[in-house]
């Protein structure tokens, strides 16, 4: 349930807003701060699984795992004239560059997995940390758009980040990113 300015005004005794998730973009954070109401979240909730899921989606796009699983079950491999069955070109991730926008907990979890795949990891984050610097090379956004073969968005949805992928940023990206 969103916690808007109106909601806070209807609850004059509110002393704390605790969001049971990783982000708090459902809260009018600026207004809460103006009223002196702390806003907290559960920062480590889902960290590892979200990173794992993000990379799983990339692996599906690159390897067509679901499609190949279904076609093997349907007998296409058996009907293949040679021992090698694949029905779509696959994309090898080794040596490719992954760009991560937002290198907080989830971005770092994602970076660890991408590093294990021997990908070059670059990242943009307004709040650079030593932990993040061990996992990725910090770059500005224009560099990230230009150098990345794949891009992950692990940033909160704020007015500054809404629409971050748009015509202008897409024009700065490699073809096929």
Model regions and ranges:
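An N-terminal-biased, well-structured beta-alpha scaffold segment characteristic
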Residues: 1-40, 146, 166
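Residue-level detector of alpha-helix initiation sites
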Residues: 2, 23, 41, 45-49, ...
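Mobile beta-alpha loop/short-helix "lid" or hinge segments that flank ligand
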Residues: 26-31, 67-80, 119, 128
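Rossmann-fold dehydrogenase core element
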Residues: 33-45, 174-177
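Residue-level detector of anion-binding/catalytic polar loops
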Residues: 38, 60, 120
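Phosphate-binding beta-alpha-beta segment of Rossmann-like dinucleotide-binding domains, i.e.
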Residues: 43-97
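Rossmann-like dinucleotide/phosphate-binding beta-alpha-beta segment
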Residues: 85-175
């Amino acid at each position: 349930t969103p916690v808007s300015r109106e909601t806070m005004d209807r609850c004059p005794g509110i002393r704390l807003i605790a969001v049971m998730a990783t982000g708090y973009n459902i809260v009018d954070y600026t207004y809460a701060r103006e009223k002196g109401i702390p806003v907290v979240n559960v920062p480590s909730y889902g960290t590892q699984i979200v990173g794992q899921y993000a990379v799983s989606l990339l692996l599906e796009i690159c390897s067509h795992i679901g499609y190949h699983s279904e076609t093997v079950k349907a007998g296409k491999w058996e009907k293949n004239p040679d021992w090698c069955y694949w029905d779509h070109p696959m994309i090898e991730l080794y040596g490719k560059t992954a760009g991560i926008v937002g290198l907080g907990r989830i971005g770092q979890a994602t970076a660890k997995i991408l590093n294990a795949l021997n990908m070059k990891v670059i990242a943009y984050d307004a709040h650079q940390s030593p932990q993040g610097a061990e996992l990725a090379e910090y770059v500005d956004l224009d560099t990230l758009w230009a150098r990345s073969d794949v891009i992950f968005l692990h940033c909160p949805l704020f007015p500054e980040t809404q629409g971050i992928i748009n015509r202008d940023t897409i024009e700065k990206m490699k073809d096929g990113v």
